[in-house]
Amino acid sequence: MNLFIFTQWYCLEEYHGAKPIIQFVILLWFLCFKVPPPDAFIVQNPPSVPTLVAVKWASSMRKLAFIVDWHNFGFTLLGLSVGRSSPFVSIYHWFEKRYGQMANGSLCVTRAMQLELAQNWGIRATVLYDQPPEFFCPTSLQEKRKLFCRLNRYLCHPLGVRDCVTAKIGADDQNESLFRTQVDTDILLKPNRPALVVSSTSWTPDEDFEILLEAAVMYDRRVAALLDENDSADEGVLWKEISGGKQYLYPRLLFIITGKGPEKEKYEEKIKRLNVKRVAFRTMWLSTEEYPLLLGSADLGVCRHTSSSGLDLPMKVVDMFGCGLPSITICYWFDF
């Protein structure tokens, strides 16, 4: 089957004045006269205006099937920039719903979105889940050992003076890391290793990093209360016991935060000022080869991406699932 798949995204901030009309004319001309005749047009939504309108008109003129691939709702994205009460959002919603109903077929990325389309839009959609690239897969023990040996020099040095995962092992030790040690040919997990939590961020104001810091402090306080520890107890004694191999009922947490962005230094300073005993943070930038290995080596993934509709599945979570990593995220109506 010969398909033409249209996935071009237009900037929502540009939907003013005559721009959508100009885009509509150019897109319609392109689809009608420049594209060799396919069997169907598949258009990714959003954007909805003018894309859905242009593709629907082109499919009608060329007598081709018109299929919409729903990844989110365009009117909810527009509402983030102009406000949900704006009349432009209502108009956009009408166009999106009306032309979505004209499709010969619909695909969507979650069952929650499928239910929303069926109940409130009158659209029957087939769920086609997003899939991660093949290199997002579980990490073998040997790959984990090599990865953490490479990262050892970063993991052993805290953002502050010292923390609960500051290790005595050498940064160049190729047989031992915070999590594993090698004895002869056997790779063994350390019994008192920290639990590894991974989150990626662009360090921008639209990503709420504060919530992760608050959760870390809450965990630290909760564990101290459950173990009936005195708040004034010297953390140095605790860390010395941990370095000596002592095991506790509740694990230490090591958060590795990956990514680059404008607010990185701001939050690194906040991390340095955290008064926690069982939680540590490391910030780093990983290569495209190392990031999937880290996901496959972690115990938990955290995604702080917020969705305008709450119905689409973030690709960060898809990547984590591909690596076999359980994930927690912010207020999604996940129904798989």
Where are the regions a protein language model picked out?
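A short, charged, and often flexible helix/loop element on the N-terminal side
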Residues: 13-29, 81-88
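An aromatic- and histidine-rich active-site surface loop
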Residues: 24, 38-63, 68-76
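Membrane-proximal helix-turn-helix segments that form the acceptor-binding/catalytic region
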Residues: 50-53, 57-61, 68, 86-106, ...
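Helix-loop-beta element that forms the nucleotide-linked donor phosphate-binding surface
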Residues: 101-102, 107-108, 113-170
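Conserved donor-binding/catalytic core segment of Leloir-type glycosyltransferases
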Residues: 157-171, 179-180, 186-207, 212-218, ...
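A conserved mid-protein helix/loop that constitutes part of the nucleotide-sugar donor-binding site
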Residues: 202-244, 262-265
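Nucleotide-sugar-dependent
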Residues: 207, 285-321, 326-336
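Nucleotide-activated donor-binding/catalytic signature segment of Leloir-type glycosyltransferases, i.e.
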Residues: 234-259, 264-293
